[in-house]
Amino acid sequence: KRAVDFDLLKQELSDVLVEGEKERYQLTWPGKKEAILNANTPIDKTLRPIKTDSVDWDSSQNMYIEGDNLEALKLLQESYLNKVKCIYIDPPYNTGKDFIYKDTFKLPLDEYIEESGQVDQNGNRLVQNLESNGRFHSDWLSMMYPRLKIARNLLRDDGVIFISIDDKEVDNMKKMCDEIYGIDNFIANVIWQHSIQPKGYLGKFSVHHNYILIYAKSMDYSLESLDRTEEHNKAYSNPDNDPRGPWRSGDVRNALYRPNLIYDIVTPSGKIISPPANGWRWSKETVEKKISTGEIIFNQDETKIIRKIYLDDLEGRAPETIWFGKEVGTTRDGNKCLKDLFDNAVPFDTPKPVGLIKRILELSTNGKNEEIVLDFFSGSATSAHAVMQINAEDGGNRKFIMVQLPESTDETSDAYKSGYKNICEIGKERIRRAAKKIKEETGADIDYGFRVFRVDSSNMKDVYYTPDKLKQGDMFDLASNIKEDRTGEDLLIQVMLELGLELSLPMETKQLEGKTVHYVAGNSLIACFDDNVSESVIKQIAAEKPLRVVFRD
């Protein structure tokens, strides 16, 4: 429902400042309130297990979910609240032709102009129209906002999210994440060199980079250090045969003015070395101790002191905000990887290289305690590939959750011609092939499987009818409110989601007196969805002393 903004109208008709609603610095757009509401609106959906597409269903703790990622995130909220260690997403970059989600909030131009306050209800223009394409930014913001908001709920307190983006929306993405995650939780804006080869557009810049915005959920996060290479160690040498090994010289000056650290240093021959303007880095007593241990030495003419930083004292290296393609891979490397996996066919445009996601995992995870990695714009499933690769290399036990909308492939594409009718088919097959390749190359004993789920309508019938809509013949159909095509396993997954149980928990099925009984994580949950369960079966289930029991009725 549209309404007149009287405060704005008063200001437009006045040549002096009109008191009204207090202004504040914020990111806003037409449709933001609906986007916020959309994040909190419940859905009548569930996840259904697809065992035929899964690999090692009984033992795997990895997951692949087909469906709208907003719906999937909402369904995962109870089970994975505060449990995800790392999120990586590569969302649509808002090129004008990549909107494929149901909640795109697309507005006609005239409606956008009115909602954004550029005209009144009579069509009179209030300000010059400088935003003819602004509605596309609004659509994109409204699509991303609820997804990022729910994603934050899934992160652990020490969790981190990495977001790939390009120049078109990096500014809006930064402001939106500042609002959702908090500006104090902004970690870095990394520049990734996605291309090395020049594009050769004369008169224009050849663009070779994208961005990766990094946010923590809270200040409890900590980044892992990166491994050092020969390139990083080449500045270290041992010209004086120090028994502590290679070293390089370090700064001895204080960065801030410290009058209590201003003092002269006397050399072994009695010379005086005056302090730097801000003072030394340490107290006089500490300097004397470092001189006695050889950590601080004098140059040959005793005019200055040299501090030694030993290579053996360094634990890895700090990450930098520029990631070069030669270190983490480029888009061309991502294409080559897919080409190798799919027998020289490239079924996906611009896949991210495995090395890029590995770098993200190296920084945000350590492979211990079954850390969960989530990618809800998973595309060709590079993130799943990277999780298996790094687990094979360091013996980690990271688990992945991939979410992807089953977007149809173009009928003229190599993917379609190869039999992959949607992106999910590409992603699942990529995981299967990558797992086979990694296992053959490394022989590592890791989780190579994944459980497949599909977002679907609720397992329950809609039995809430008004009396005038209900016919007498319908009464028999309503005797059971469970849809006829749903199985006991469908019902089990819905119950697990409602109870907040992880879908990676071990599941087992047994037969008790002809009735199918489902066990989740031993006796954490026991469920039977058959009709007419006997008292004897109930007593046998009770003897297991389950934490939770669910029956059909």
Predicted regions, residues:
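DnaQ-like (DEDDh/DEDDy) 3′-5′ exonuclease domain used for proofreading
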Residues: 1-88, 93-146
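Conserved helicase/translocase motor-coupling segment
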Residues: 498-517
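Signature of N6-adenine DNA methyltransferases within the class I
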Residues: 144, 156-158, 167-226
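Active-site-adjacent helix-turn-beta-strand microarchitecture at beta-sheet edges
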Residues: 216-343
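Cysteine-dependent PTP/DSP-like catalytic domain, specifically the C-terminal lobe
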Residues: 124-139, 185-188, 199-200, 359-370, ...
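Conserved class I S-adenosyl-L-methionine
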Residues: 370-379
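SAM-dependent methyltransferase catalytic-core segment centered on the flexible catalytic loop
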Residues: 81-160, 168, 209-210, 224-255, ...
